[in-house]
Amino acid sequence: MANSKSAKKRALQSEKRRQHNASRRSMLRTYVKKVIAAIKSGDHKAATEAFAAAQPIVDRMATKGLIHKNKAARQKARLNTKIKALAA
């Protein structure tokens, strides 16, 4: 338990940030799941549109430090590879 005034403030700020990050992480996962669902359905157009919507979100979360930039690049590359395989 925080005893000093500054420790209490830090605890409050930490909890606030945790909840904010959890919300953003959930949003990120939702966008990625939409792309995966479109890929599994086999609809190339829907998958492409979902990927176009998810791509800036993934990049933004990497910029904000929510996920590592390499993870963002890896996610985008893997999803894009699967979408290209649908077209072939």
Swiss-Prot record:
Residues 1-27 are annotated as: Disordered. The keyword RNA-binding applies. The keyword ATP-binding does not apply. It comes from the Bacteria. GO terms for biological process: translation. Keywords: Ribonucleoprotein, Ribosomal protein, RNA-binding, rRNA-binding. GO terms for molecular function: small ribosomal subunit rRNA binding; structural constituent of ribosome. InterPro entries: Ribosomal_bS20, Ribosomal_bS20_sf. GO terms for cellular component: cytosol; small ribosomal subunit. Gene3D superfamilies: Ribosomal protein S20. Belongs to the bacterial ribosomal protein bS20 family. Binds directly to 16S ribosomal RNA. HAMAP family: Ribosomal_bS20. This is Small ribosomal subunit protein bS20. It comes from Shewanella denitrificans (strain OS217 / ATCC BAA-1090 / DSM 15013). The gene is rpsT.
